[in-house]
């Protein structure tokens, strides 16, 4: 089940990242400004703000199997429709559609893990699951300009190709995802259909620990989406070819895969997880600043550190939510919906502000300062976490 969920999360990462390496040809073909392109790359995050919470509740009621199937189908449609865009409005709408299917996947896969795994296994499984999205992003960034675009001939055909790949993955889940392993305890498999939900949402809203993690999540999405969506263009303006810029950005994502796998395991060795989160935020801010100001070896070091420390935040925050007594497997969909709904405010603002500040100042450096300042400032929130967290 973890491997099937990984494939769907791979499709998720592939689809949402595919626009980033194609920014230049899309802007030229459709006549878009940097502000418009920033709005496009942040469109699905904007929809997340309104869709994630109700979809999280639906996932708790509908179950993981149907939810992940619907999510995989919708994000594949989002990719296909991007190829038909003739202007800003059409491209914005097709990317925004991802904000309907995306939550079904990004909330559904953690719920899948919370049902199938317990204890330390959840940390490892969350890291592996997160690597699916990261590998999808890495493939989109590393292969789009160097292999896929030359093969299919046009940026529109790239989106068609990735959409068909997504539909293929949805078909695999349709055929195999509904058959739980006989080694899985029945009470765990059935828990998704027999939840006790009285007063759940009201109790969740009163939990201070959940809100602190949500605030940190806002900045994670701000930095992650803001940097990943614009890094290829930043590197191109520093003199890299589109293919090399894609390779470099995929290297950041590969570093993020390692961070997602290593840091959650390391986290269990420490009594104070807030120290882990504070370290991730501080180093991420430094790395982002180095990317904006550095050249040569320093630039490469910044790319590697930004990927490792920024990406590692996601599984750490997810595991902390899972392990809260008020959450667990039973209410992970509801809490995940809250996390993504509010967190994706940052997911929209990151890409949008990077594009807007580029138009205003004619430099990406102002956007880099914005991301760095927000990341560093959020370390204050870690002080409010309970010491046992």
Tell me the role of every PLM-derived stretch.
Residues 17, 45-53, 138, 253-261, ...:
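Residue-level signature of mid-helix packing/kink "hotspots" within the transmembrane helices
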Residues 19-20, 208-250, 256-260:
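Extracytoplasmic gate region of multi-pass secondary transporters
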Residues 50-88:
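Conserved MFS/SLC helix-loop-helix module at the cytosolic interface between two early adjacent transmembrane helices
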Residues 61-71, 268-281:
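Cytoplasmic membrane-interface "Motif A"-like loop-to-helix N-cap segments
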Residues 94-133:
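Cytoplasmic helix-loop-helix junction between adjacent transmembrane helices
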Residues 273-320:
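C-terminal transmembrane helical hairpin of 12-TM major facilitator-type secondary transporters
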Residues 327-363:
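A late C-terminal transmembrane helix in Major Facilitator Superfamily
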């Amino acid at each position: 089940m973890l491997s099937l969920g990984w494939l769907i999360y791979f499709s998720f990462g592939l689809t949402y990242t595919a626009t980033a390496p194609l920014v230049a040809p899309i802007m030229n073909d459709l006549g878009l400004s940097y502000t418009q392109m920033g709005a496009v790359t942040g469109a699905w995050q904007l929809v997340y703000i309104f869709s994630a919470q109700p979809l999280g509740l639906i996932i708790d009621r509908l179950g993981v199997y149907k939810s992940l199937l619907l999510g995989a189908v919708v994000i594949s449609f989002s990719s296909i429709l991007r190829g038909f865009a003739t202007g800003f409005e059409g491209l914005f709408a097709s990317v925004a559609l991802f904000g309907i299917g995306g939550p079904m996947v990004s909330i559904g896969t953690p719920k899948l893990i919370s049902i199938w795994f317990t204890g330390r296994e959840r940390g490892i499984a969350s890291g592996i699951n997160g690597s699916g999205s990261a590998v999808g992003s890495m493939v989109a960034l590393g292969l789009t300009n160097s292999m896929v675009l030359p093969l299919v001939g046009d940026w529109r055909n790239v989106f068609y190709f990735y959409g068909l790949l997504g539909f293929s993955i949805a078909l695999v889940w349709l055929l195999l995802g509904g058959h739980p392993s006989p080694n899985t305890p029945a009470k765990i498999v059935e828990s998704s259909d027999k939840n006790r939900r009285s007063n759940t949402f009201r109790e969740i809203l009163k939990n201070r620990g959940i809100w602190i993690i949500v605030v940190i999540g806002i900045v994670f999405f701000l930095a992650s989406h803001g940097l990943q969506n614009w890094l290829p263009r930043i590197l191109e303006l520093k003199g890299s070819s589109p293919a090399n810029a894609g390779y470099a950005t995929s290297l950041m994502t590969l570093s993020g895969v390692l961070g997602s796998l290593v840091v959650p395991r390391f986290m269990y060795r420490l009594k104070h997880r807030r120290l882990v989160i504070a370290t991730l935020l501080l180093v991420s801010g430094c790395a982002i600043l180095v990317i904006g100001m550095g050249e040569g070896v320093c630039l490469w070091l910044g790319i590697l550190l930004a990927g490792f420390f920024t990406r590692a935040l996601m599984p750490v925050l997810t595991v902390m939510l899972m392990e809260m007594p008020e959450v667990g497997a039973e209410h992970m969909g509801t809490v995940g919906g809250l996390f993504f709904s509010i967190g994706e405010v940052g997911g929209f603002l990151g890409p949008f502000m990077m594009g807007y500040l580029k138009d205003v100042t004619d430099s990406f450096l102002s956007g880099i300062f914005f991301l760095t300042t927000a990341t560093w400032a959020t370390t204050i929130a870690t002080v409010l976490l309970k010491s046992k967290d």
